[in-house]
Amino acid sequence: SKILANFTAPYTATPVKRMQEAGAIMLGKVNLDEFTYGSSNESSAFQPSPRNPWKTDRVPGGSSGGSTASVAAGEAPLSLGTDTAGSIRQPAAFCGVVGVKPTYGRVSRYGLIAFASSLDCPGPVARSVKDAAAMLQVIAGADAHDATATPLPVPDYLAGIEDGVKGMRIGLSPDYFRITYPDPVTGELLSQVLPAEIELAVRQAAERLASLGAEIIEDVPMVNTRFGIPAYFVISRVEAASNLHRYDGVKYGHRSDLSTNDLKAMYKHTRHEGFGLQPKLRILMGMYVSAAQYSEQYYRRALQVRTLIRRDFEAAFDPRGKYRLDALLTPTTPTTAFEMAAVYGDSVLMQYADQLTVPANHAGVPGLSLPG
């Protein structure tokens, strides 16, 4: 973001510090959507934005598209991203690399530029599952600087990584093979099946897992998946508006050169000059839906939906329940990587690219995107 263009952080983020202490060599920063607000990388204040290294007329995905593109292009074996609604997993799918959203609280957010604090998760991007596991082993763990970082011991993510899937119960849900989206004219929610090539890829993966000894559990209900994006629209905007208020030009970051003795005018001009379109849209919507007269109608209901989504996952993974899943196999994205500029500018359509990933953020559970 332009508002932090010349900002030098006074301390090192915990995940970065832990990588450095483990001997990692930091090559530099990569580009991303402004404040992570996007699913294509095109909203970055620093242009040109990254392109998909496999097909350069396509987006790398976002918001952590610079992370996934750099790993896919062979510029680095590992990269660090953040995932609020799919921002590691979606670009990992578009770029054909491994992306992990850890359990919420497993990796410290200290030093992270916050988007939606109850959803944000730093995590690894790598060329292989083994590399991703090794990186997560390093960055995970309790942190006195972050009250949301869990104090639970970090498991050995590399132990048993070669054991295979024999005996595992892996679920398929029909609710992940349909996408729900708003009619651009009426606003009515419509539903359609995923493109055949995407469903086929998942079905073939299930067949392969079954051949390796996994038990595939069909028709696992995840009925509240379709409400994930509308709830995310509200929750993330309220939290983003709150987090963005700290950028006012007083102590750090961009400050307007406009001569004025009015503090409010300085705030206004600084934010107008420093924020791009996407932060401005999130501030407006966040302040609107959190206003006293609308909070019950929108924000409270969105939090209730988040609880329903979490219960879907709890029922699916309950060791004493009907399904007793070890994993849920789903598509990562409802489309393949789209062309540059094809979707950018349509904030609603862009957000619906995260429809299949955002439920894991609402539930706080881990998610992994694997290339086909």
Can you say where each PLM-predicted feature lies in the sequence?
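Short, well-ordered alpha-helical
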Residues: 1-8, 36-37, 151, 157-161, ...
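Gly/Ser-rich catalytic/binding loops embedded in alpha/beta enzyme cores
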Residues: 1-84, 203-213
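Short, well-ordered beta-strand elements within core beta-sheets of diverse protein domains
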Residues: 3-8, 120-127, 286-291
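Glycine-rich, small-residue loops and helix-cap segments
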Residues: 9-12, 20-21, 25, 198-203, ...
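Short, solvent-exposed turn/loop segments enriched in Gly/Ser/Thr/Pro and often Arg
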Residues: 30-38, 223-228, 333
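Structural signature of FAD isoalloxazine-binding scaffolds in flavoprotein oxidoreductases
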Residues: 89-95
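A short helix-breaking turn/cap at a secondary-structure junction
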Residues: 98-200, 204, 259-269
